[in-house]
């Protein structure tokens, strides 16, 4: 069954005019929700993501609670890595841990290929369930970017400085480019499968790429990103790029064949546009503001919206994920304010 959905988010992604500014929030499904915390008392991340009914419920929760204009699939960026031979364990209080980190070209050559229908059928089943039976807003599929995935694979887990990753990039360029190619192939196949299953847009998260300078990005990372976006673009859905602490790279992203440039709070929207970013923009509230009094939040959000609405193609989001400490009522109130304020301003 084909469901009728609210396409405001998709219109904004395409740079079209909308009646109001669409909004969704990174990590909108997660630790800030009491319902989610109850589920996590009984089930692990692995168990939730491997159970399509449970995962679909978690994914849809913020749509029902906050009235956001898009859902994003609840899963981890590490989800596809076991399929290519990477042993990943999500450890509480630490994050992803990999016991067999990449150290050589031989390690890279041992990596396999992903076959989503065989390797991650539960993810595709979750997407099908959501898009055929549950959602009246678009579902966003996603993947980690090659650099961020490689950083976990080389460091063996989270890092503060990514010294091992960048040292590998500089000292072993042949192995590095082989790894980028392997990961680009995986991301392309993975995203296409999500789209075929029903995702109406996709976002690529490059969480740690801000540690790389512009010159190195152009040489060591951008070619893989160009290939990913060019190949996935043939699927005909909007594509979003997001990184953290990477304001110096927004023009590099703008050059890629994508639709939406994601911004964090470090770069004002009007400054990004002054630098030549003329594609659709998503962002860019500092999630720390969500812990402030409502009067402070409202004034801050007005400023962001006033910048974003100056040209068509704007999606409100946070610059990073929702904190566990955020009151769900604040997010609900925020969405209502974004919709009402922007509708009034755009009608003038």
From Swiss-Prot:
General function of this protein: Catalyzes the decarboxylation of four acetate groups of uroporphyrinogen-III to yield coproporphyrinogen-III.
One GO CC term on file: cytosol
Primary localization class, coarse: cytoplasm
Subcellular location: Cytoplasm
HAMAP family tied to this protein: URO_D (MF_00218)
Pfam families linked to this entry: URO-D
Signal peptide feature range: none
Domain of life: Bacteria
Stated family: Belongs to the uroporphyrinogen decarboxylase family.
Annotated metabolic or biological route of this protein: Porphyrin-containing compound metabolism; protoporphyrin-IX biosynthesis; coproporphyrinogen-III from 5-aminolevulinate: step 4/4
Binding site for substrate: 27-31, 46, 76, 152, 207, 320
Molecular function terms from GO: uroporphyrinogen decarboxylase activity
Species this chain originates from: Bacillus thuringiensis (strain Al Hakam)
Reactions the enzyme catalyzes: uroporphyrinogen III + 4 H(+) = coproporphyrinogen III + 4 CO2
The protein's Enzyme Commission number: 4.1.1.37
Annotated site, Transition state stabilizer, chain positions: 76
Full protein name: Uroporphyrinogen decarboxylase
SUPFAM superfamilies: UROD/MetE-like
Quaternary structure annotation from Swiss-Prot or TrEMBL: Homodimer.
Biological process, per Gene Ontology: protoporphyrinogen IX biosynthetic process
Keywords linked to the UniProt accession: Cytoplasm, Decarboxylase, Lyase, Porphyrin biosynthesis
Keyword Thylakoid carried by entry: no
Enzyme class: lyase
Cystine pairings recorded for this chain: none
